[in-house]
Amino acid sequence: MQTSFDVIVIGGGHAGCEAAAAAARLGATTALVTHRFATVGAMSCNPAIGGLGKGHLVREVDALDGLMGRVADQGGIQFRMLNRRKGPAVRGPRAQADRKLYAAAMQALILATPHLSVVEAEADDLLTSDGRITGIRLADGRELGAGAVVITTGTFLRGLIHLGERSWPAGRIDEAPALGLSKSFERLGFALGRLKTGTPPRLDGRSIDWGAVEMQPGDEPPEPFSVLTEKITNPQIECGITRTTPATHAVIRANVHRSPMYSGQIQSSGPRYCPSIEDKIVRFGDRDGHQIFLEPEGLDDPTVYPNGISTSLPEEVQRAILATIPGLQRTTMLRPGYAIEYDHVDPRELEPTLQAKRLRGLFLAGQINGTTGYEEAAAQGLVAGLNAALLASGGGEIAFDRADGYLGVMIDDLVTRGITEPYRMFTSRAEYRLTLRADNADQRLTGQGIALGCVGAERTEFHTAKMAALAQAKALAQSLAITPSQAAKHGLSLNRDGVRRSAFELLAYPEVDWARVEAIWPELAAIEPSIATHLEIDATYDVYLKRQTADVEGFRRDEGLLLTEIDYALVPGLSNEARGRLEKARPRTVGQAGRLDGLTPAALGILAAYLRRDQRRKPAGSAAG
């Protein structure tokens, strides 16, 4: 067995798979260390990928030739574009997935990735020398050497499951936790915290009264996540929707003292935007009902995931709750819901590359950084894997900022502000939403990926052809123009100012769509429908994008003012409070400093002025020595 690698990735979940594949795509010899290969790509919680904000992350992972989008397309059994009635900037692609198909597709891609080996073992300790990681020790005593290590342990770090009054160590139901690595982190001086998440009971779909619930079909035709997926081929299913009732709430109120969250058994924070059903009833007791989505877990699997009733109440209470919900009164519970507590590292311990500040060569991704969700984990895994491979080869680093994509927004939020509860991605977290759309993720990021070397030949060829087609289509649409009087003959009412307007400009008008401009200029019919859709969106946002481009330029100027070597004691005019916050956080740039809690605009102005003054004092060429 090989005992030395460029990169070792610990954990075979969504972060680990992306990290291992990304490192291997850059040519790094990579080991994916996991308890059992059979659990690689497992969907531990809900059987779905994407959603609002999250779908953007999946598209961005795909744009950098990651796995999740293609795997979701191969495993997807219902596709929906959320927020379809709203603008493209806040739409979110989402898919229900067949758990078995999803895991099988992920495992097949992992096995087919050159330079990537799978090691079935438990990682027990980190090996270090002179402030740098050198490898890992397995539970059986074997040692594996590496130039960089990525840890993606999910909920396994000292995982503790809670079900009613009972609790036991586990990383997932029926799977052992990782205890040794938590001790390694503590020995190395990392600040560890505890978080919790939960999952609902699983139901036998054959015992659900589907006639008593509302049915929700997917989109037709289904829209894939990956630009490389030509067509979704799986049969598509419907989901069900039901609601809790006042009787449900009465059962929960009568038993809430038996919930580990309210008995004092669980002290850690859970996800605010995905609360347990008992938390919903306590916090929103005035509502007459809460929605529950009944999500089938597979095409040949009767298991149904009731999204919306995550709980850790005792098993018999869970059965009593189900008996009060329309359509579920006679359902069979296959497995009770439960809560799980686990260790996480304060993400402010990390650089924007996801490398640990206190230990060179160690990268962290996923729930260990305080996030929740498959998509958040996958995006972090990809960034950590790329940087681990770059470090191992001596090839620099890649950091995505808030203007690059949602993955940059998420990582900046984590490493700058830290977390007090599990972090979830939303479109509202991004300042540059009009630029960072799910539909243009490849236009924003694939070029960077090609330059970096992490994008394969198939995607490179596809991207090059697409960008050329887009440029050609835009040039044609901008070259075709009419006067207001000519437009009136086609039923368009424009200002009678004598100004000619191009087809591209007309698409920005609310009453003008592609069909209308195509009717005026039949030559536009030659443009491929997918390219026409991109062009229509670009035209709609064109005037706003010009304004946002100016905002991004200002942001990038602040990001270009580096603070990495500054001595804050030498900066005149800074308050002691500002000095203390800056010393503790050690932000990399003035832009990042501005996103720290409690730092005033005045302090930022002092910093920026000091840096510019300092740069003017330095003689030319001083940076080179």
From Swiss-Prot:
It is found in: Cytoplasm. NAD(+) binds at residues 270-284. PANTHER family: GLUCOSE INHIBITED DIVISION PROTEIN A (PTHR11806), PROTEIN MTO1 HOMOLOG, MITOCHONDRIAL (PTHR11806:SF0). One of its GO terms (biological process) is tRNA methylation. Pfam families: GIDA, GIDA_C_1st, SAM_GIDA_C. NCBIfam families: mnmG_gidA (TIGR00136). Gene3D superfamilies: FAD/NAD(P)-binding domain, GidA associated domain, C-terminal subdomain. FAD binds at residues 11-16. One of its GO terms (molecular function) is flavin adenine dinucleotide binding. NAD-binding protein involved in the addition of a carboxymethylaminomethyl (cmnm) group at the wobble position (U34) of certain tRNAs, forming tRNA-cmnm(5)s(2)U34. Transmembrane segments: none annotated. SMART domains: GIDA_assoc_3. Homodimer. Heterotetramer of two MnmE and two MnmG subunits. This is tRNA uridine 5-carboxymethylaminomethyl modification enzyme MnmG. Its main location: cytoplasm. Belongs to the MnmG family. GO terms for cellular component: cytosol. Its cofactor is FAD.
